[in-house]
């Protein structure tokens, strides 16, 4: 593929400060595969990481995150286009999801984690990867997606009563909204754990205490460890639990009668 200046990733740049542990040598090949784009090559890189013992959380922190950081830096240097950057994000998401499909699903009655990006937040890949990590840690994960209004998040919490809520915040300008959302969740559902994460907390750890959350995470490994350590018993969903199939059938039936 031709770059604007004909360059490959800068030498050593993909294995810099954002790279951790034994997967650093795979970051460069992953960047090349993402920008090709070559999904088979991406999956081959993931398979190589898995052969070294990397689980989904390590894959996200030590490989995907530094690779996408490098793609972003290449965009800032004028070496790739916005379209190429967006395509790289889509490719890595598809490949990561396929990789996660080999992990056994959480057991019946597993605790539930609700994930959502704040209103105005359009960077949703991190939260989607975290959802796969959570499932691998034995939690059911439900993702509301990007730019979800606060009222919609609160309404879903009232309906589903998850065991924990994870809010994704990438931009410093959204920290106030993050704090307000955390406070509203506390008032609505005092027993629900509220977690926050995103690149803004990776850039400045001091912002964590400003949100009022139960825990703050700058990477998927720390979140995985928290989820494993704080996993409720399978039958401890609390009251009221999420609506069962019968309640959902009645809701759908009522909706159909209303339209008729």
Predicted regions and their residues:
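Conserved hydrophobic helix-helix packing surfaces used for dimerization/oligomerization
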Residues: 111-113
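Short helix-loop-beta junction
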Residues: 128-142
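Cofactor-cradling patches in redox/metallo enzymes
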Residues: 135, 143, 148-206
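Residue-level detector of anion-binding/catalytic polar loops
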Residues: 55, 140, 163, 214
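Long amphipathic alpha-helical segments
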Residues: 1-107
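Peripheral docking tails and interdomain loops at the edges
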Residues: 200-260
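Active-site-adjacent loop and "lid" segments of alpha/beta metabolic enzymes
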Residues: 117-125
């Amino acid at each position: 593929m031709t770059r604007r200046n004909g360059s490959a990733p800068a030498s050593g740049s993909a294995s810099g400060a954002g790279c951790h542990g034994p997967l650093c040598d795979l970051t460069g090949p992953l960047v090349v595969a993402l920008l090709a784009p070559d999904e088979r090559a991406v999956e081959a890189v993931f398979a190589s990481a898995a052969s070294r013992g990397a689980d989904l959380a390590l894959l996200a922190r030590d490989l995907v995150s530094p690779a996408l950081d490098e793609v972003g830096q290449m965009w800032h240097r004028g070496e790739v286009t916005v379209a190429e950057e967006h395509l790289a994000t889509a490719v890595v998401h598809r490949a990561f999801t396929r990789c996660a499909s080999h992990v056994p699903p959480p057991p019946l009655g597993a605790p539930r984690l609700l994930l959502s990006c704040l209103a105005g937040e359009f960077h949703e890949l991190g939260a989607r990867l975290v959802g796969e990590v959570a499932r691998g840690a034995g939690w059911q994960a439900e993702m509301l997606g990007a730019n979800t209004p606060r009222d919609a998040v609160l309404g879903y919490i009232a309906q589903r009563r998850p065991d924990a809520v994870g809010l994704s915040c990438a931009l410093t300008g959204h920290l106030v909204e993050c704090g307000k959302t955390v406070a509203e969740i506390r008032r609505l559902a005092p027993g629900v754990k509220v977690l926050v994460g995103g690149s803004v907390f990776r850039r400045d750890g001091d912002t964590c205490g400003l949100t009022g959350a139960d825990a703050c995470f700058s990477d998927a490994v720390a979140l995985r460890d928290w989820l494993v350590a704080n996993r409720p018993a399978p039958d401890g969903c609390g009251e009221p639990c999420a609506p069962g199939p019968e309640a959902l059938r009645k809701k759908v039936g009522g909706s159909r009668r209303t339209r008729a």
